[in-house]
């Protein structure tokens, strides 16, 4: 699952992205 907008857990850390909002 790829989530490209917002904050989510990628398995080892929180990732925050605004790359395709």
Swiss-Prot record:
One of the record's GO molecular function terms: toxin activity
Expressed in which tissues: Expressed by the salivary gland. This peptide is considered as a venom peptide.
Subcellular location, record wording: Secreted
Cystine pairings recorded for this chain: 4-20, 5-21, 7-16
Top-level lineage group: Eukaryota
GO cellular component: a single term: host cell postsynaptic membrane
UniProt keyword list: Acetylcholine receptor inhibiting toxin, Disulfide bond, Neurotoxin, Postsynaptic neurotoxin, Secreted, Toxin
Purpose of the protein: Injections of 20 uM of this synthetic peptide (Ile) causes partial paralysis to polychaete worms (Nereis virens), the natural prey of terebrid snails. This paralysis may be due to an inhibition of nicotinic receptors at the neuromuscular junction.
Domain notes: The cysteine framework is III (CC-C-C-CC). This peptide has a cysteine scaffold similar to the M superfamily of conotoxins, but it displays a disulfide pattern previously unknown in native cone snail peptides.
Name of the featured protein: Venom peptide Tv1
